[in-house]
């Protein structure tokens, strides 16, 4: 009975892929895959990739005298450097995308103090949670 069972398993295809046992044996006997031929040596490629470094991006060139003057005036008005960078990035991105709330005048899409975002972005949000920094 066992011999008949093994004979059926070995000779009959088990699925649409053919005889599973034969496929397993062929897979075991297969040699190692050959290495792909690359035209550039590995150390040369790594040397090239490691030489590509992005320079640190400044929003505005601080070496220009008018930018230094604006920066000093900004600090004199009581803002810190992080606030300066935030405001610069905000004003420089004005008009780039049309997705701003109320046509690009307000920086935030909804009230920052709200525990959840707006259900409908086209409605006003009145109440005590309004963030007055944006007005």
Curated annotation (Swiss-Prot):
Entry GO terms, CC: apical plasma membrane; cytoplasm; extracellular region
Propeptide: 19-55, 120-135
Record key words, sorted: Cell membrane, Cleavage on pair of basic residues, Cytoplasm, Membrane, Secreted, Signal
InterPro entries: Augurin
Cleavable signal peptide: 1-18
Location(s) in or outside the cell: Secreted; Cytoplasm; Apical cell membrane
A Pfam family annotated for this UniProt entry: Augurin
Keyword Transcription regulation: no
UniProt similarity note: Belongs to the augurin family.
Function: Probable hormone that may attenuate cell proliferation and induce senescence in the central nervous system.
Family annotation (PANTHER family): AUGURIN
UniProt name for this protein: Augurin
Organism: Xenopus tropicalis
Gene that specifies this protein: ecrg4
């Amino acid at each position: 009975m066992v011999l008949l069972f093994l004979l059926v398993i070995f000779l009959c295809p088990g699925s649409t892929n053919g005889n599973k046992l034969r496929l397993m044996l062929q897979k075991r006997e297969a040699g190692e895959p050959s290495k792909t031929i690359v035209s550039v040596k590995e150390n040369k490629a790594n040397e090239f990739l490691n030489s590509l470094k992005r320079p640190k991006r400044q929003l505005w060139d601080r070496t220009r005298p008018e930018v230094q003057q604006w920066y000093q005036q900004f600090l004199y008005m009581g803002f810190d450097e992080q606030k300066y960078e935030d405001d610069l990035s905000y004003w420089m991105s004005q008009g780039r995308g049309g997705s701003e709330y109320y046509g690009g005048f307000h920086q935030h899409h909804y009230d920052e103090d709200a525990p959840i975002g707006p259900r409908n972005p086209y409605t006003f949000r009145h109440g005590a949670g309004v963030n007055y920094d944006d007005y």
